[in-house]
């Protein structure tokens, strides 16, 4: 079982006191959506909330500063949906904590990438170079795979890339020093490390720009972020309305205007072809 950290967001702290209130006790036209701070909160505020409000919904966005509390809040009824994670993380977290949560729809996703405040090129790597990376298993695997692709390390042959860990590093080719940190702390680590892997949401929330990255992953479907809901809510009308909002032309326009460089889900790529 994961330990539940305190929420830093004042709004989230206040809202967490109502975790015992089941979602079905609320007006079904009042939706509470949890997100990580940064672009996924902005996607809801700028794109999804206006669409749903035109349909008569009241939408409240609760921002979290960690990857743990949003799923507990969703399972316990404090949230109706959340948007911050990919399917690998959702599946593992739900299994480990016996939560009945399901994917609703993929969302535009910012890639994990390598940033540096001390170096302008990856070619400056040398023996003893410090590299910070996420300490959670799924995102650490993404970082290790990219390091393998860059030729800085070598992973064990035939390793499942979504399960790669430090134990699978067979050769530290550049003799770098890996420093696992909580994902939210990685932007700050840039002051003290040579290079840091930073998840897209935390990068943008901290003021980093995607085009400043020295290397970016190519996002696969496994790492495309998603909207999660309680499995029991799958057939409810508001769920269909929420999904339709993400699939809309209006949200595609918001994505193109405000989230350039994000990897678009298949439905947005298909819609883009039809509207051109």
Predicted segments, located by residue:
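Short, well-ordered beta-strand elements
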Residues: 27-38, 57-63, 130-131
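Short, polar/charged alpha-helical segment
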Residues: 38-60
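Short helix-initiation/N-cap motifs at beta->coil->alpha
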Residues: 61-72, 159-188
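Beta->alpha turn/N-cap motifs
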Residues: 63-67, 77-78, 82-91, 108, ...
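Ligand-binding "clamshell"
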Residues: 92-104, 118-119, 190-192, 197, ...
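A conserved helix-loop-strand patch within extracytoplasmic ligand-binding domains
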Residues: 104-154, 252
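A bilobed periplasmic-binding-protein/Venus flytrap-type ligand-binding module shared by bacterial periplasmic
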Residues: 111-122, 224-238
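Periplasmic-binding protein-like
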Residues: 141-148, 246-266
């Amino acid at each position: 079982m994961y330990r539940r950290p305190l929420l830093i967001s004042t709004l989230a702290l206040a809202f967490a006191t109502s975790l015992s209130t089941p979602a079905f006790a609320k007006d079904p036209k009042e939706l509470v959506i949890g997100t990580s701070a940064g672009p996924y909160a902005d996607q809801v505020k700028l794109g999804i909330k206006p669409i749903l409000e035109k349909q008569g919904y009241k939408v409240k966005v609760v921002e979290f500063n960690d990857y743990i509390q949003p799923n507990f809040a969703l399972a316990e009824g404090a949230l109706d949906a959340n948007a911050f994670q990919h399917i690998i993380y959702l599946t593992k977290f739900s299994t480990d904590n016996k939560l009945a949560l399901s994917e609703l729809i993929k969302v535009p996703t910012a890639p994990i990438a390598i940033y540096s405040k001390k170096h302008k090129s990856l070619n400056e790597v040398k023996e003893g170079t410090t590299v910070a990376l996420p300490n959670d298993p799924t995102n650490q695997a993404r970082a290790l795979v990219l390091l393998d692709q860059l030729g800085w390390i070598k992973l064990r042959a035939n390793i499942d890339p979504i399960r790669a860990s430090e134990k699978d590093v067979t050769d530290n080719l550049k003799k770098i020093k890996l420093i696992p940190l909580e994902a939210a702390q990685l932007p700050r680590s840039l002051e003290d490390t040579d290079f840091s892997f930073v998840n897209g949401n935390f990068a943008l929330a901290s003021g980093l720009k995607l085009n400043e990255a020295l290397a970016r992953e190519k996002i696969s479907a496994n790492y495309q972020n998603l909207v999660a809901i309680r499995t029991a809510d799958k057939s409810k009308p508001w769920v269909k309305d929420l999904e339709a909002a993400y699939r809309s032309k209006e949200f595609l326009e918001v994505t193109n205007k405000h989230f350039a460089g994000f990897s678009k889900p298949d439905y947005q790529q298909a819609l883009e072809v039809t509207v051109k």
